[in-house]
Amino acid sequence: MRILPELLKPYPYLQSRQSGHLQVSELHCIYYEVSGNPNGKPALVVHGGPGGGSQPEYRRYFDPTIYMIVQFDQRGCGQSTPHASLEDNTMWHLVADMEQLREFL
C-alpha cells in the first residue's frame, strides 16, 4: 500500500502569477490568486472556515502543468474586505462570488 502516500505527495511550492481584489458587491471585495497553467483546466480552491483564508500550500495539491489554480478568500475571510463581516454573507453570496470571479478571469 505504498502507492497511497505517493498519490498524496504535494507538488513543489508555486508562486501565484496573478492576484488582486474583485469588488463583488457594494460592500464586499474578495481577494484572489491565480497560478499554474494559464490555459489549463480551471480548479477553484474553496478554503475552510469560518474565518479562514487561502494558503499557498493549498495549490500544491494540483498539478500546475494541467490546472489553472484559482484561490480566493471568501467574504469576511483572509485578505477580503471588510474583514469578519457577516453582512450579506450567505452561501448564495458565496456561489454568486465564485461565478463573478469565473467571469472576471
State where each predicted segment sits.
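Short, flexible loop segments at the rims of nucleotide/cofactor-binding pockets, characterized by
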Residues: 21, 47-49, 87-91
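Conserved acidic catalytic loop of the alpha/beta-hydrolase fold
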Residues: 92-105
